[in-house]
Each structure stands twice: as structure tokens, then as C-alpha cells.
Curated annotation (Swiss-Prot):
Effect of residue 15 to A: Strong decrease in cytidylyltransferase activity
Residue numbers spanned by region 2-aminoethylphosphonate aminotransferase: 250-616
One GO term (biological process): organic phosphonate biosynthetic process
InterPro entries: Aminotrans_V_dom, MobA-like_NTP_Trfase, NH2EtPonate_pyrv_transaminase, Nucleotide-diphossugar_trans, PyrdxlP-dep_Trfase, PyrdxlP-dep_Trfase_major, PyrdxlP-dep_Trfase_small
Residues that bind Mg(2+) 2: 136, 220, 222
Residues at which pyridoxal 5'-phosphate binds: 313-315, 390, 441, 490
Function: Bifunctional transferase involved in the biosynthesis of cell-surface phosphonates. The aminotransferase region catalyzes the transformation of phosphonoacetaldehyde (PnAA) to 2-aminoethylphosphonate (AEP). The cytidylyltransferase region catalyzes the activation of 2-aminoethylphosphonate (AEP) to CMP-2-aminoethylphosphonate (CMP-AEP). Cannot use phosphocholine. Exhibits strong activity towards CTP, limited activity towards ATP and no activity with GTP.
Cystine bridges: none
EC number(s) recorded for this UniProt protein: 2.7.7.107, 2.6.1.37
Keywords recorded for this protein, A-Z: Aminotransferase, Magnesium, Metal-binding, Multifunctional enzyme, Nucleotidyltransferase, Pyridoxal phosphate, Pyruvate, Transferase, Zinc
Protein name: Bifunctional 2-aminoethylphosphonate cytidylyltransferase/aminotransferase
Length: 616
């Protein structure tokens, strides 16, 4: 797995004349986006966690780009005017601690090249193409094993031409170190050394393979002719190629699984791996560390919390908590104000856990005074509740409920399946001890991984609790992973890779910005509902902004099935209500849904409703 990249962007770009006098050539725009930003987006879509950009000329452009993409680290080559690309790579080297991709900043290319390098088992690998006739080629010479033996802009200086250097290379950290050591020796006599020169020297002692893709679509933009060729011929070809690999877009307006990006879908396509390998254990540990951060404020110490993962659904994670976190001597109070609270009560009942149910309206806010009176009886050691009731979109005020429960000495167990990563939260200030969620809701991954984020002190107390469940036992799973770096049973490997990509994309967007995007979509939906004269089940001030339960129109012409099928014809999936005594349908705006897509849906909703005489 390649997780780091370096982009060399220190050059003056003088051959592009006035176009790069006041900006770096990486900021030439093609298709409305700077070419270096296109490269950054492609790297992120291929699972790159850290992008080190070596800057020089007009470095502030890259510093501003880093504000948009948290994965970017910029490092300025202060002597950029007097050094070659190797000088810029040298200043980046200390920020690289493992194998990485090395790219030039002035490239446009088909993203298939990244996949090809990342997926290849060879550790040091140069991407090459067939003949481009660009007029500024760097030719590569190879031996019988397709390993680099020479490179030059003068093809007559080489014995054979294996391909042309693209400017994207996969290297190990040790190879980078050899390149830097060689460059250091020659600072005085070769001050303007290019990275290719140092790589060729390293190739004398380390195999550096060449991967030639004969018809690879790319262009390095060094002069105005290159730019014209890129705009007219190369870029349209790249766009066409990448569109061919795009997955058909279906906008899921159901409450989960949610719509995912193509990059999350494609993250599942990886080389087979035994989940007992250390590399996969490292991946799971990284996920555990990252997942809890989305539920904690920056000032909260993450060492006080642990993430425990299972191959299961969100309901599975709920069952983990309920069955594992209440001792035989305890008593559980379950708040039931929707199907998911009722589900937690059902789980407790099946395990015969001593329990009472606090029943409340499915669409009106909880009576907090009545709830506190129940807490004050001091009958209960544990509280189980749902943060966001997916049945209706009702958001329970956990910032009041859980601290109130803690006041009465209760351990709090929370289903945050439909709240986590959709809104900022801090388990510590909320007073949540155990929180369940899943990979397929607001974190925007694929279905298959359930997890519990635990207050570590409370988790340790469960060590001696009765083991009511084998597969879903919380402490056993936690202790086994801590000891072996493995789960007790086979994890959903490909789903874990997709979850990793979803985590990276959540870090890029941030939970706060995701909440704002979800809210923008919700505002569009609510405005359309009101304009049509439809009614929402839950008052706006008590809604989550994630899911909206809409009362079905009172006309015999209405049919949910007909509305569902009409929406499906236009690539939208909607979901029926789950309240037995109230007829509703639900529209969710979670996942990778954009405001423009919600606008398109509301147009279709209006079209259907007007067709049956509603909102006319």
C-alpha cells in the first residue's frame, strides 16, 4: 500500500514565458482546474494520505492549496532558482518515511497510471509510455529485465529505447536516501542536478524497473506548444478514458447504506491479502485510531478511548454494546422513541438483561423532566438510547440526556449509527461511554463494518462481565486485538479498504463541512416540501437535518410504489416510513449527495406530486 507522495514544484517554468511569470506552471488551468490540483485529487482518490509538495517559484500558490487539502504539506526550496529538481526533492526527503510516489507538477495524465504503479509488486518502478512526439522527450534505456540502465534527451546516446519517462515514479525510502546522498556529494559540481540523474545513479546498485504502457495518455507541459497540445488533444482523451471507468451514479435517498464516491468503491479492488498479515493488522489499527477522532473534540485525549471493530451491521454493533456492557447485577433503562430504540430494548430482552423501557412519542421531543424523574429512582446502572432516530429524523438531545444520566451514576450506551460523522460530537463532553456506528452511513463507506467507540476505563470494567455472546463480545474482541493485532474471526477485508478511503475523504471534507453540506441538502428538501403543501412528521427544530419523514398526501391517487419507481427511473432511491400507525415516506440526505442532486430530486418530486393533484 502506497500512502505518501511527493510533487516536485519548485521550478520557474520560464519556457512558458508570461504564463508563469507570476504563478507556478502547476497552476495552469485545463478544464477549469489547475493541473497540479487535478493531480492532488487523483492521488487522494487512490488512497494517498500525505502529499509533500516541494515548492519554490511563487510558493504561496501551493501554501494556499494546502489550506484546501489537509493532506498537503508544503516545503519550500529556498534555493530553487539555483538548483534542479533534485534540490527540491532533497528538501522534501525528511518528510518521507516509507515508499512513495514521486511526481512532477506540470503533468496531466490518466489516473490509471497511478493504479498501475501502486498495484505493481515491484518496489522501485518508473512509469513510461510509448512515443509521444512531444519534442522534449526523456528516453529510457532498459536491460533484459526491464530495469533502468540509462536515460537521456538524446536518443542516440542510448543503446535501445525502452520508453519515454512520464514523470511518475514509485520509490522506496532507501532509494530516496541513496539519491539524496549522491546529490549531496555533488552540490558543488552539479548544483542543478535533476532527480532523474540521481535516480539513474541509484539504479546502478538497486533494481529500478520500468513499466511501459504503450498508449498511456499524458503530457508534460514545458512550453506553449505542449500546452496547446494538452488542451486540444490530450486532456479530452484523459477525460474520456476516466469517464469510461466511472460507476453509474445512483443517488440513495434511503437512510443507509449511503451513496459512496467511486474512489471508495474502487478502494475495494486490491490484491488479496490474508487478514492475519501484519500489514492488514496495521490497517485495522490505523482505522481504530482514526475512527475515534471523529467522535472527539480536539482537546479530548484520544488515549482515553478505544475503537473495537466487528464484521457486522450497525444493529450488530448495538448488540455488541447491549449484550456486553451490562453486568448481571445491573439494570438497564432503554429510551424507546422509535424503531431503533425499540430494537435496543428487543436485544436486551432476548439476552434477559434486567431492563425497563422509557416509552416516548416517535415524533415529539422527549419529556426531559419525566425522564430525569425516572433516573432519580436510582434503579438503573445503565442507560441505552439512540442519538438520531432514523425512523423519523428526530434528534434526541444527548447533550442533556447523557450528562443527566451521569449525574445519577449511570453508564451510557448510545446508538449513534445515523449521527456519527454527520455532525460534530465529543463523547467526553456528551458523557457517552459506549457509542456504536457503522461503515455505511455518514462516514460514507461500504456496508460490513460495525464498531463501538468506548470510554477505555468503562471498557476495562466489562472484563469480568458475563459473556452472553461469543462472536459479538466486546471485551474479548478488544483484548484479542490488543494482544495479537488481529480480530478473533475473519474481518471483511475489502470493506476495510473501502473504509480506509472513506476515512481519508472524511478527513479531507471534515465533519463540520459535511454537516453543512447535509444541511444545505436538507434546506432544499424542506423548501420543496413546504411549496408542495406536504407536511413533515417532526417539527423542524427537532430534526437532525439528515432524514426527513414526510406524511403521505391524503389522496387515493398517491402510491408509494409509484413514487418509488418514478424516482428510480431518474436514478434516485427513496424509502418508505417505518411507523405502523402513521403513513410516511422518508428522504435521507446523507452520503455523497450534493445540493444540486437534491435540487434535481425535488424537481422530480414536484413532477410526481403535481401529477396526482398535489401542490398544483
Amino acid at each position: 500500500m502506497i500512502k505518501q507522495a511527493v510533487i516536485l514544484a519548485g521550478g520557474l517554468g520560464s519556457r512558458l514565458k508570461d504564463k508563469t511569470k507570476t504563478m507556478p506552471k502547476g497552476f495552469l488551468e485545463i478544464g477549469g482546474t489547475a493541473i497540479v490540483e487535478q493531480s492532488v485529487q487523483k492521488l487522494l482518490a487512490h488512497g494517498i494520505e500525505k502529499i509533500v509538495i516541494g515548492t519554490g517559484h511563487c510558493n504561496e500558490y501551493y501554501d494556499n492549496l494546502a489550506k484546501k487539502y489537509p493532506a498537503i504539506i508544503t516545503v519550500k526550496n529556498e534555493n530553487y532558482a539555483n538548483t534542479g529538481s533534485m534540490g527540491t526533492l532533497e528538501v522534501c526527503a525528511s518528510f518521507v518515511n516509507e515508499s512513495f510516489l514521486l511526481l512532477e507538477s506540470d503533468l496531466i495524465y490518466d489516473s490509471a497510471g497511478l493504479f498501475s504503479l501502486i498495484n505493481d509488486e515491484r518496489k522501485n518502478l518508473i512509469l513510461a509510455s510509448g512515443a509521444t512526439k512531444s519534442g522534449d522527450e526523456v528516453y529510457l534505456e532498459a536491460d533484459e529485465k526491464n530495469c533502468l540502465t540509462g536515460l537521456s534527451k538524446n536518443r542516440d546516446a542510448l543503446k535501445n529505447i525502452f520508453g519515454e519517462l512520464v514523470g511518475i515514479t514509485k520509490l522506496t525510502k532507501s532509494t530516496l536516501d541513496k539519491m539524496c546522498a549522491y546529490a549531496k556529494i555533488h552540490h558543488s559540481d552539479l548544483p542543478k542536478m535533476e532527480y532523474e540523474h540521481a535516480l539513474l545513479e541509484a539504479a546502478k546498485t538497486i533494481p529500478v524497473a520500468i513499466k511501459r504502457i504503450e498508449y498511456f495518455v499524458w503530457r508534460e507541459i514545458d512550453n506553449e506548444d505542449h500546452l496547446e497540445m494538452a488542451v486540444k488533444n490530450i486532456y479530452p482523451h484523459i477525460v474520456e478514458n476516466e469517464k469510461l471507468r466511472a460507476v453509474r451514479r445512483e443517488v440513495l435517498l434511503n437512510p443507509g447504506p449511503a451513496t459512496t464516491t467511486d474512489s471508495v468503491k474502487y478502494a475495494q479492488v486490491s490484491a488479496d491479502i490474508c487478514p492475519r498479515e501484519k500489514a492488514f493488522g496495521d490497517l485495522m489499527q490505523w482505522l481504530c485510531d482514526e475512527l475515534k477522532l471523529f467522535a472527539l473534540a480536539s482537546e479530548t485525549n484520544p488515549d482515553e478511548y478505544e475503537t473495537v471493530m466487528f464484521g457486522c451491521s450497525g444493529t450488530g454493533a448495538d448488540e455488541v454494546m447491549v449484550s456486553s456492557c451490562v453486568p448481571d447485577t445491573g439494570r438497564l433503562l432503554v429510551i424507546d422513541n422509535g424503531s431503533y430504540g425499540a430494537r435496543m430494548a428487543k436485544i436486551a430482552d432476548i439476552y434477559k438483561i434486567p431492563m425497563d423501557i422509557f416509552k416516548s412519542s416517535t415524533y415529539e421531543p422527549l419529556d426531559l423532566q419525566k425522564l430525569e424523574a425516572e433516573f432519580a429512582t436510582k434503579k438503573y446502572t445503565h442507560l441505552a438510547c439512540v442519538y438520531h432516530e432514523t425512523t423519523t429524523g428526530l434528534l434526541n438531545p444527548l447533550h442533556i440526556i447523557c450528562p443527566m444520566a451521569k449525574k445519577y451514576g449511570m453508564v451510557t450506551i448510545v446508538d449513534a449509527v445515523s449521527a456519527y460523522c454527520g455532525m460534530p460530537m465529543d463523547l467526553k463532553s456528551l458523557g457517552i461511554d459506549f457509542m456504536a456506528s457503522t461503515s455505511n452511513k455518514n462516514i460514507q463507506g461500504m456496508a460490513g463494518v460495525g464498531f463501538v467507540i468506548c470510554n477505555k476505563a468503562e471498557l476495562e470494567k466489562t472484563k469480568d462481565y458475563p459473556m452472553r455472546n461469543y462472536y459479538l463480545n466486546l471485551y474479548d474482541q478488544y483484548a484479542y486485538f490488543a494482544k495479537t493485532h488481529q480480530t478473533r474471526f475473519t474481518p471483511p477485508v475489502q470493506t476495510m479498504y473501502a473504509l480506509r478511503q472513506a476515512v481519508l475523504e472524511t478527513k479531507q471534507e471534515t465533519v463540520q463541512k459535511r454537516y453543512e453540506r447535509y444541511t444545505a441538502c436538507w434546506n432544499i428538501l424542506v423548501a420543496a416540501i413546504k411549496k408542495l403543501g406536504l407536511k413533515m412528521l417532526v417539527k423542524e427544530e427537532h430534526q437532525s437535518h439528515f432524514i426527513t419523514a414526510i406524511l403521505e398526501p391524503e389522496t387515493p391517487k398517491y402510491s408509494f410504489e409509484a413514487l418509488h419507481d418514478f424516482a428510480a427511473e431518474h436514478s434516485f432511491t427513496i424509502y418508505p416510513g417505518k411507523l405502523g400507525n402513521i403513513d410516511t415516506f422518508r428522504i435521507a440526505n446523507i452520503g455523497d449527495i450534493q445540493p444540486e442532486e437534491m435540487r434535481r430530486f425535488t424537481v422530480k418530486l414536484k413532477e410526481y406530486m403535481n401529477g396526482i393533484g398535489v401542490g398544483v
